[in-house]
Curated annotation (Swiss-Prot):
This is Protein-glutamine deamidase Cif. Changing K152A: No effect; does not affect ability to mediate deamidation of host NEDD8. One of its GO terms (molecular function) is protein-glutamine glutaminase activity. Protein-glutamine deamidase effector that inhibits the host cell cycle and other key cellular processes such as the actin network and programmed-cell death. Acts by mediating the side chain deamidation of 'Gln-40' of host NEDD8, converting it to glutamate, thereby abolishing the activity of cullin-RING-based E3 ubiquitin-protein ligase complexes (CRL complexes). Inactivation of CRL complexes prevents ubiquitination and subsequent degradation of the cyclin-dependent kinase inhibitors CDKN1A/p21 and CDKN1B/p27, leading to G1 and G2 cell cycle arrests in host cells.
Length: 282
């Protein structure tokens, strides 16, 4: 088994801005089934009210495939009616205020990240809950990645203090010397990067693989307070457009404030969950 080497990058590697996607070494966009399942989930959540409430549900003690979207919707409607009564407003006015116009709610980055983790990991007897899971530092993550089995797939949840952002890195099985990865995210546009719908990212960019080394290089650069806007734009902007970044919003005092959660996953489990969700939301 080959190990992936993750030494601290030199200042030159941090400042070149080069994110080198070797298309011969990584998966082509349509070969990674997990990415396709996440794309289908994002599309469903943008169009179907039941799926959207599953995406935004904060009851993480219940596995995503065991939730009752109809019951959740009924509770939401009851709460909105009560708010309308308490505030002396119409239901429509309340929905505008809380961002629930037409029922579809665009999730924050953290909500999206949590929902994707549940899609990957939830099964009978286990329900992913961000607050309850082990958190790794960058050094601990690097150690784990250095001995990651090539025959297994992993999902990584990232809390990125510098960007004020949370996102998912999907690491399918593959040779560690050129291990592919896929980045999943949404963004309300309140930080460094612009507003981004979950479905738009999954449709237009998420199926294009990056190298795991490249995202790890980003972690290392930011932890050394070496900010490369081209690197950030290449990874996180839907068009790779540096001009769309708001550099003034980078939290430099939090440049090393990364936390990670890393889990092995089974692609069959994702497929099972997405099929159940589609059935629940039909």
């Amino acid at each position: 088994m080959k190990d992936i080497t993750l030494p601290p990058p030199t200042s030159a590697s941090c400042l070149t801005g080069a994110i080198s996607v070797n298309t011969e070494a990584v998966l082509s966009p349509m070969q990674h089934t997990s990415a396709l399942h996440v794309r289908d989930f994002a599309s469903l959540c943008s169009q179907n009210l039941k799926a959207n409430v599953l995406l935004n549900s904060d009851d993480h003690e219940v596995p995503i495939h065991q939730k009752n979207p109809a019951a959740i919707m009924q509770n939401i409607d009851s709460n909105i009616k009560q708010m309308a009564t308490d505030w002396g407003m119409s239901i429509e006015e309340v929905e505008v205020i809380i961002g629930r116009e037409k029922g579809i709610v665009e999730p924050s980055c953290g909500v999206t990240a949590n929902a994707i983790m549940k899609l990957f990991l939830d099964k009978d007897g286990f329900s992913y809950c961000f607050e309850n899971e082990q958190t790794l530092s960058l050094e601990q993550l690097q150690e784990r990645l250095s001995c990651m089995p090539e025959c297994k797939s992993f999902v990584l949840r990232v809390n990125d203090g510098a960007l004020g952002h949370a996102y998912i890195v999907d690491i399918p099985k593959g040779e560690n010397s050129c291990r592919p990865a896929f980045l999943y995210q949404s963004d309300l546009g309140e930080g460094v990067t612009r507003k981004l719908r979950f479905e738009d990212w999954m449709t237009h960019k998420a199926l294009t693989p990056i190298l795991l080394d490249d995202i790890c290089n980003y972690f290392s650069c930011m932890s050394q307070n070496k900010t490369d806007l081209e690197q950030i734009a290449t990874l996180f902007d839907i068009d790779g457009n540096v001009k769309m970044l708001r550099k003034e919003n980078i939290q430099y005092q939090k440049h090393d404030n990364f936390s990670f959660q890393l889990f092995e996953y089974d692609t069959d489990n994702i497929e099972k969950n997405i099929e159940i969700i589609k059935s629940l939301c039909s």
